[in-house]
């Protein structure tokens, strides 16, 4: 028996009575011991070798097409034949580049849609900030004098704790 399980049996008094709390603890320990034994039995069963049956392979959901050529270049040519009506004359010279362009166009935003007003504003603001940063002008230098004055007044309105303490001591 485990040493922690042996300690569980020491809960009884000399008279042999056990409190309700100790009884719950004993029952819990007993369940833990049974679970531990069951786990050990399962581990032993798992370790013993069993005769295995030959299993038939499960039918997979994916069936590869038989006509797909193994070479990537051949695959590209096959894909280009399927999308040939979309291609222009100069794409026939460089099929891989044209295919790459088609793939990129399919994933990106359509170029026909004009930028919305918000997007234009955002791009314009971003461009302006970048230009100012290149020139070395920060936003603080561009601030209006009213904003700076307002910020200074706000700081003066809220004295620090040290100032408040000194004022209190001075007028006491």
From Swiss-Prot:
<dbReference type="GO" id="GO:0006325">
    <property type="term" value="P:chromatin organization"/>
</dbReference>
<dbReference type="GO" id="GO:0005634">
    <property type="term" value="C:nucleus"/>
</dbReference>
<dbReference type="GO" id="GO:0003682">
    <property type="term" value="F:chromatin binding"/>
</dbReference>
<feature type="region of interest" description="Disordered">
    <location>
        <begin position="40"/>
        <end position="61"/>
    </location>
</feature>
<protein>
    <recommendedName>
        <fullName>Putative Dresden prostate carcinoma protein 2</fullName>
    </recommendedName>
</protein>
């Amino acid at each position: 028996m485990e040493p922690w399980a042996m300690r569980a049996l020491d809960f009884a008094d000399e008279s042999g009575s056990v409190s309700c709390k100790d009884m719950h603890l004993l029952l819990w320990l007993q369940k833990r011991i049974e679970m531990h034994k069951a786990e050990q039995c399962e581990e032993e069963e798992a370790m013993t070798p069993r005769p295995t049956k030959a299993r038939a392979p499960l039918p997979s959901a994916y069936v590869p097409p038989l006509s797909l050529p193994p070479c990537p270049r051949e695959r590209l040519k096959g894909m280009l034949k399927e999308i040939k009506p979309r291609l222009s004359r100069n794409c026939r010279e460089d099929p891989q580049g044209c295919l790459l362009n088609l793939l990129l166009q399919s994933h990106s935003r359509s170029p026909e849609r004009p930028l919305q007003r918000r997007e234009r504003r955002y791009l314009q603001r971003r461009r302006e900030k970048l230009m100012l940063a290149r020139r070395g002008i920060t936003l603080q230098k561009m601030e209006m004098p009213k904003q700076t004055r307002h910020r200074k007044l706000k700081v003066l309105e809220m004295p620090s704790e040290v100032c408040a303490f000194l004022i209190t001591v001075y007028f006491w």
